[in-house]
């Protein structure tokens, strides 16, 4: 789709240029005392009135994403946008107008010199070329935007789905990790069950120890005619310690830390190959 001329009016063109916004984050906070909004971004800090901010917000909503954090704070994110900015001055009406044309030929207008200056300052870092010619051809496909200037051999390729792709990749990677961890946990649990003797064996050994110890205490008591309380108490303490140690070892072997990422590569590949082929990313994240 080709860019059309923004305007054919005989107004004076103060500046006309293109911007390629890869990523721009703007924070806006309302100052109750001064009754103005403070805009902050990597391109600078600005103050605008309430009505002026509302005008800017209407533009931001069309070219980016506006998030209302609370009653006084907004966050604006603009990414992967190519815009044609034309600052016009009407000698007849003595008014300033900023015409903004996006790659879909959607035309937006902003009036007021101070407000226009703020908008231009916000976008100046992403300027492609000053006074770029209208012969600039813009070819848009589903996957990319190619800007080709035949006179200046200007070539810019931008993935318009970059944000969505990154989001899907992160989701895909998280799902793969979760699934691998689950598989790893199940694998370790099965391996540990194979290495741990059955409960009946452990209880039998503990019971045998208790029986032998009790029989020894009983024989000594019958022989001497006195009850050995110290021996009985010591035996119970030893028995409790043995049970506690056995229980601790069993629990330690069974538990697998879900946040442990030391996962064999072979297991990762197996899980991805069998379960993750249809994930949105379409490839195994590195």
From Swiss-Prot:
The keyword Cell membrane applies. It is a multi-pass membrane protein. The chain crosses the membrane at residues 201-221, 231-251. Keywords: Cell membrane, Membrane, Plasmid, Transmembrane, Transmembrane helix. It is found in: Cell membrane. This is Uncharacterized protein MJECS10. One of its GO terms (cellular component) is plasma membrane. It comes from Methanocaldococcus jannaschii (strain ATCC 43067 / DSM 2661 / JAL-1 / JCM 10045 / NBRC 100440).
């Amino acid at each position: 789709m080709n860019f059309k001329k923004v305007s054919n009016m005989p107004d004076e063109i103060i500046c006309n240029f293109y911007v390629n916004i890869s990523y721009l984050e703007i924070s806006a906070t309302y100052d109750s005392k001064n009754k103005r909004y403070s805009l902050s971004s990597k391109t600078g800090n600005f103050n605008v009135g309430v009505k002026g901010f509302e005008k800017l917000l209407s533009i931001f909503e069309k070219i980016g994403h506006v998030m209302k954090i609370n009653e006084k704070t907004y966050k604006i994110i603009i990414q992967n946008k190519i815009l044609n900015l034309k600052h016009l001055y009407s000698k007849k009406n003595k008014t300033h107008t900023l015409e903004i044309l996006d790659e879909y030929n959607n035309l937006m207008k902003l009036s007021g010199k101070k407000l226009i200056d703020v908008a231009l300052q916000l976008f100046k870092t992403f300027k492609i070329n000053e006074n770029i010619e209208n012969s600039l051809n813009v070819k848009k496909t589903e996957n990319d935007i190619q800007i080709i200037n035949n006179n200046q051999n200007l070539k810019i390729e931008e993935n318009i789905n970059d944000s969505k792709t990154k989001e899907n990749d992160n989701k895909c990677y998280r799902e793969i990790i979760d699934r691998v961890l689950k598989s790893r946990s199940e694998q370790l649990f099965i391996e540990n069950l194979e290495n741990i003797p059955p409960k009946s064996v452990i209880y039998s050994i503990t019971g045998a120890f208790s029986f032998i110890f009790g029989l020894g205490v009983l024989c000594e008591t019958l022989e001497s005619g006195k009850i050995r309380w110290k021996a009985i108490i010591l035996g119970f303490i030893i028995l409790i310690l043995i049970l506690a140690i056995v229980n601790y070892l069993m629990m330690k072997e069974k538990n697998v830390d879900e946040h442990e990422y030391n996962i064999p590569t072979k297991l990762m590949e197996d899980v991805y190959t069998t379960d993750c082929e249809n994930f949105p990313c379409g490839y195994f994240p590195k």
